[in-house]
Amino acid sequence: MKNRYIQQFEDTQLKDKTMPAFKAGDTLRLGITIKEGEKTRTQYFEGVCIAIRGNGVDKTFCVRKIGANNIGVEKIFPFYSESLASVEVLRVGRVRRAKLYYLRDRRGKAARIKEVRH
């Protein structure tokens, strides 16, 4: 259990942060702010959210994409990170698990996730 003063401070930090609602299985496009010397630029990372863990300020999510030469790339982002410029949900996936770590072993069509039909 957290100290109530710490909890109040964390709540004030989270008030002005807004994130779209997403869950494991959704395809996301993340805009990541990168600072190189004096310049800043936005680099986009697109992949499937395979896990969300933690709560409050400590909440993180893991995004996986297949890069060049069929190499899987996973990045873990803090939910309320200052370096996240934008988060966009491209597809809503239909999965029955909260953690999709089994996708690490799948290749090609076996790694696909069904899309939610409206």
Swiss-Prot record:
- Alphabetically ordered keywords of this record: Ribonucleoprotein, Ribosomal protein
Q: Which GO terms describe its cellular component?
A: cytosolic large ribosomal subunit
GO BP term, pick one: translation
User: SUPFAM superfamilies from the entry?
Assistant: Translation proteins SH3-like domain (SSF50104)
Q: Which GO terms describe its molecular function?
A: structural constituent of ribosome
Q: Which Gene3D superfamilies match?
A: 2.30.30.790
Instruction: Give the UniProt family note.
Output: Belongs to the bacterial ribosomal protein bL19 family.
Q: What does this protein do?
A: This protein is located at the 30S-50S ribosomal subunit interface and may play a role in the structure and function of the aminoacyl-tRNA binding site.
UniProt protein name: Large ribosomal subunit protein bL19
